[in-house]
Amino acid sequence: MKRIRVLLLLATVLSAACAKDMEDNSAAMPDDAFLLSNDKIAVAIGQDGSLACLRNMNTGHDYAADGLLWRMYYDSPAEKEIQILGSDQTPDVSVDGNVITLKYHKLVSRGTELDMQVTLTVTLEEDKVRFGSALINNEPHTVIRELHYPLVHGAQLPKDHKLFTAEAGGQLFDNPAQVIGKISSSPYKKPEQFFRQKDVKYGAKVFMNCFGLFGENQGLYFGSHDQTFQDTWHGLRAYRNSASGKYDVLEFGFFKYPHCFAGETWECNANVIAPYSGTWHVASRIYRQWVNTWWDHRKTPDWVYGMKSWQRVIFKHQYGETLFSYDDLNGKVDQAGQSVGCNALFLFGWWAEGMDHGNPDYSPDESQGGDAALKEEIARYQANGNHLLLYYNGKLIDRESRFYRSGAGPRVCRHDNTGSEILERYKFTGQGTWLGEYDQRTFAVATMMDPEWNKVLMGLQDRAYNLGAHSVFFDQLGYIEKESTNWDTSREYPVPDVFGIQKRAQCLKLLRDRYADMAPDFALGAEGTVDALAQYCDYTHGYPANDGPERWINFFRYTFPELVFTDRGLRDDVDVPRHVNNTVLDGQRNDIEIFRCRDIISAAPVYQAYLAKVNEIKEKYADCLLYGRYDDCFGFSSSNPGLDARAFVGKERMAVVVANQSGEKTQPTRISVPGHKFVEASVTGNGKVSSNGTKVTLGKYDMAVLVFERTDVRIGTYNLRRAKLDRSSEDNNWEKRLPRLVESFLLENMDICGVQEVDTEQQESLPALLAQNGLEYDSYFFSPYADDGVGTKAHGILWKKDRFQAGEPHFFWVSDPPELRQVNDHGNGAIKSNFYRGGFCITLSDLKNSGAKYFVIVTHAPLSKEDHAQNAHVYSDIEKKYNPEHLPSFFIGDFNAKESDECSEFYRTYWTDSYLYFDNDPSMRFGPPGTFNAWKPDKIKGPDRRIDFVYFRGNKVKPLKYVCDDTLFGGLCASDHYPVYVDFDVSI
């Protein structure tokens, strides 16, 4: 019976796709395919276990080609890396609900039957497909090393699709087949007669565990949503086409490394694929929604946000050459920094042995007065408003160091698959050839989270703090290596540690948390910006350099706007404007590393002059460019796509950065920023901006920064959940979550905010606490449980003190007559009780927008569908009574109702639902549909949980964007509802 239902569903789905007159590139699907579908995605598995369909239901494009879904590799005593192909196996396939299951009760390789079992699941979720896997190995003397799953083999790509990888923060390749199909730098070291491969390993200079194929209006997202952060390769292969001989049979997927021995099992349910509609920002939001379930990034110290650039300078080099002395710190080094508006020094080679020498001894340089003299110079430097960042290497152990020779080095270092120490060599040279070719330094590599090594790192951190530095920095801890992992050689087969990212994350968290409360402004930095590691850093040093034609860090920057990280690679006067402009466009800080840290910026006069100009602009518009939020292309329009343009949003202003990075001749563009008025602009080179900020003209590598002041109004709603509730919850009691609520309010920066479930004490304490943090609101609260409206269980409204003047509020009850307090909500099936429900209205005059007036109703509406529907008219009656001038009208609150409920349908006859307003432009809806999270952010996101609404009414009211902000704080929600807000442009 189920089989018939699936086939009928298949026919229905495909007919619907064709009926929409959409793109339909798919070949005929096998009659026996197993199908799952919703309004966004269709996925089907053939009876033979192939991927028969992976369709975007909105566009009709099918990315699948009935190709291979998985492969596996195992080792035996006689041979390594023996391949098992899914296409050679016979699965039992079944469907149950939204899950297709493939069971392989035995496997065959080269005609030999193996006692190994594989179970694969394909689960259709709202906006993606999740691919799960479970392995059982009962084959004696074998180990399953590698699983490639899921695979989209023979991927069918639209012509406009480009390949995005997260290498070095992000690269975008116009021709996926061309870049993947290239032969490697060591031809045929791999079996390239069969396929070509682009090597991309998460964490190994790859910032995110996702990649994608992005078109203008649709794309295919691949994400390994794996909170173990185990080794994951992004499978990018081009197989040889037997018909043409070309390497154009594209395959995309994920590679995992189970190392599953005989008698063991292994599972993974982390890999997802999402055909999506819209721009690449949709894919970014999918990844960020997953990241929010584990993200634990503390509030970055303000001085770090305000850091425009740093000078990275080696004082004493590896081979003993002294480049600068402690005296120079407050002399020519600081003078060079000040000449370009740089007030931070990233200090290398400050110890006796010199840079990349003697780790982890870092002996005091007694020839200069030791640590006492260094501490004195640091204090002088920072007393002038500067910041010193003190360098250590987080993993390298010099084999000539006292630490290594004491016997500690061999105990804590990593070992390879033979049990030998893993070594690294650094080939810095003098002016001859001897050092680099013959006498380079040799380092062992420490094992992360070894207790003995942890003590070393903590001791170094303490030393930096005691020296008075504003930050401690650990080199090479913000990423993992491709190869130098630690091996366990005690088993039948040697096994590498595949949890390198996890252990470095634990190490960085340990270091961060040691000073988080005691000295919150003492910053922690690391080299590399892998997301799982960067969450524990206050800033990161960009690695590797990424400044070629494929550079495209837009995706990473948009996904992680809160991170502070630098560029890398500009070391002289070559190609300065283009490189520096990139850092402004992408919100990076400048890593000033003249001649690879051997000199200071006064030795590069072209760079010095240009950076001085750019840093002056950064300082002038610091509220946006340094402290603001990167918002990519949102909030404005630019008429010329040939010019790069980005938005940075501050509390009250927006900066639009426009640059001519193409190297082409002079180009004009027109800039429009709805809901804002132009204030001023600054340019580099011969750039020009019209007096009203609408026209920009830029020559080769010119840049303009235009600043606009907000005239829009941000109106939202936030159910705070009563303080008396959740007292027994370790994480969500009021005292624990209050700092999260404050941080959430600061992040949303709402001009007008309706709030619900506010008890008496919090009606005073919360606005006061927000004011202490720089967000000053006036407020009004109404309790429907008291005749005079004063008391607990209240809902209220907050408005910015310096922007609005309030009229007289009027409260009411959601019943007939509205002036009489009475029980008017008898609950629903889950909650049976007697509630008093009400609301209030108020008029606010906008002092910033020429005295424009807004009429606002705030409510916490009935749970009972019947009671709610019966009395829904009360709100519109109140609006008509108290808004005779027909002012722009906003109706906000926790409605305890879905959009499909009768009451919601009634409200839409009078007001417009701001969420539904963007049905024709869903790219301007941010965050999940669901607003009620029930403290379960990883599970509850769907539209049925949208119960908090922002309605509007008025011909001159235009919503600019809708946001349901599911940001977590230390992995936790601030309330059991997400805040919801809408930016409105209100014409007067």
Task: Give residue ranges: language-model regions.
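Structured beta-strand-rich core segments of catalytic domains in phosphoester-bond hydrolases
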Residues: 752, 756-853, 964
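Conserved structural scaffold segments of CAZyme catalytic domains across common CAZy folds
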Residues: 91, 106-108, 112, 137, ...
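Polysaccharide-binding surfaces and accessory modules of carbohydrate-active proteins
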Residues: 24-42, 59-108, 116-118, 124-237, ...
